[in-house]
């Protein structure tokens, strides 16, 4: 045992109790809250500020790698325009004419005219913007006073200003020739005095001269001799002409020639249509549908029926079975009664004898084939009541044989059986057809064959 103790004492050692250290008391500050819970901090924890987020840095790097994406749409449009121009330059006259014929064959005339007007409008706007740029360049100081190192830029601006001067001079000269003689002639260069005389134009009216004075001014232009005729012809070829009729109320300029104004900004006179006018439908077509062809057969239902079309008139001495008209309850409507029934009863239609009220058996058989369920239901219900009265002997022996023959020739029984079949999905049509067949079977007396 002693040996074991010596071994453990060498390994573990002696257990010695040390004196305790001096304890430091920590005073806790007890905070009392009014509601029993600690107050919530209103400030968020501060985050480490970064100069740029990863997403922004990625997008910035992407924009640097692919510059010019903002004007991608304009570049695509310019590329398409250049490709079309190159293709047109490679085509000969026959190919161009063939392409034009193909376009005319595939596009309607009114749509093609609309596209042409849109193209002319865009072209005019583009030319107007170019002229404004040129006029702003003309109003710049004298380019000849620039230093020699800017000679190239000054020459380019000088050429553009010269071309603008020639264009305006050609327009003024053509207006002067048209107002004096009325015959076209090649434009000529104007002198400095003529240009100054055209700078200010006054329009004088005899009644209110002071109130209606209008001044037209042009920028001062120096006459430049050159290829005026070529530039004028080129501008006249590419710019659409505007017809400006001269004023007819005595409006004149300083030199006595009538001034011309563009009246396209004025609204067109509104034409009021009179329904009582005999040519009302022609005016209606010209105002709202000028590009559509006129088909008289399709327009006949708009016109009032003529007296000659009224074949179901009291003055008629005899009638056939297919001309006899019936009401919705299956009763016969006489010619005199058909003239007195008002239109709001629903018995007038655009069939034969539109002045007369009622439906014939032929018209009802036609409505039995209608794809509109309401029309089909009215026809089935009316035919069922007519056949019930017919088989009951209500129409007497004078009309009954002819009406029985007409019912069989019009295949009315077959049409009713088809409407009552399971293939018809409309339940109202099926139920009314079954009811009509039941009425036919209950009153089967004078028919040559069974109704069902």
Curated annotation (Swiss-Prot):
Q: What is this protein called?
A: RNA polymerase II-associated protein rba50
A GO BP term, please? transcription by RNA polymerase II
One GO CC term, this protein: cytosol
**So what does this one do?**
Forms an interface between the RNA polymerase II enzyme and chaperone/scaffolding proteins, suggesting that it is required to connect RNA polymerase II to regulators of protein complex formation.
Q: Which Pfam family, an example, fits this chain?
A: RPAP1_N
Q: Which family does it belong to?
A: Belongs to the RPAP1 family.
- Keyword tags: Cytoplasm, Nucleus
What lineage is this protein's organism placed in?
Eukaryota, Fungi, Dikarya, Ascomycota, Taphrinomycotina
Residue ranges that the Swiss-Prot or TrEMBL entry lists as coiled coil: none
Q: Which InterPro entries match?
A: RNA_pol_II_AP1_C, RNA_pol_II_AP1_N, RPAP1/Rba50
Comp. bias intervals (Basic and acidic residues): 125-135, 156-165
Positions with biased composition (Low complexity): 170-191
Quaternary structure and partners: Interacts with RNA polymerase II.
| Record organism | Schizosaccharomyces pombe (strain 972 / ATCC 24843)
Q: Where is this region: Disordered?
A: 60-83, 125-202, 223-261
Q: Where in the cell is it found?
A: Cytoplasm; Nucleus
Note whether Cytoplasm occurs among the keywords. Answer: yes
Polar residues: which segments have biased composition?
136-154
PANTHER family the record matches: RNA POLYMERASE II-ASSOCIATED PROTEIN 1
